[in-house]
Structures are given as C-alpha cells and as structure tokens.
From Swiss-Prot:
GO terms for molecular function: toxin activity. Belongs to the scoloptoxin-16 family. It is found in: Secreted. Keywords: Disulfide bond, Secreted, Signal, Toxin. This is U-scoloptoxin(16)-Er3a.
Amino acid sequence: MNTVSVVQFLAVVCAVFVLYGRGVFAAEGVKKAGQHKDAELCLGSDGLGHRLDEFWYNDDMCQRFLCFKDDEGIMYEQIANCPIAIAEGDCTLKPGTKGHYPDCCPAVECPPEDQKEGEI
C-alpha cells in the first residue's frame, strides 16, 4: 500500500459506524508495528514476533490482531476490537461467549419486527 492507500484504509477501518440502526458501533485501528529481531516477523503489541498475514488473538481483551506490510515494506498491526453495544428500546444486551474475537463480543438482540407490530 502506498501512503494514500494507508490513509484511506485508516479512514475506513477507524470510522465508527452504526450497524442495523440498533445502536451497535464498531471500530478498528491500525498502528505501525515494532521491529522484531527477525526481519520477517512483525513485533506485535504483545511483545512477540508474528508472521505476516496471520491472525493472533488476545482472548482476555477480546481482540484480533493482524500484521501486514505496505508497498514500501513498512509493517502495520491491525487491531480489531469488539463493537460498543448499546441496547435501546425492546432490545437487550447479550454477553459474548468465551473464545476468540468476534465470538467473545457482546451483541444487541432485538425482537423480530413482526412481533413488535403484533404488540400494538
């Protein structure tokens, strides 16, 4: 990726957006990765070396990481976090399951639209 592509990529993945109009917001971030002693590995924020284009996880924080290299050879670490979940109206917040991102993320559950209409 050239500099413009990286900026465009950052603008897209760092944008906060609403999913389904139900109050679920999501964000991802990208940061320049540190230099590992093995030039083919990316130094992750966990302090360990990781292969390019392979995912690793922090299950305690419910995060997924990916290391990639741009066209100029600069390594970046992409960090995917759980969406911010806000339950509004008849919707409820359901905790995530244990395990890797995104399964460990909480989710907003809402009754089906036809069930809501029958209540009126």
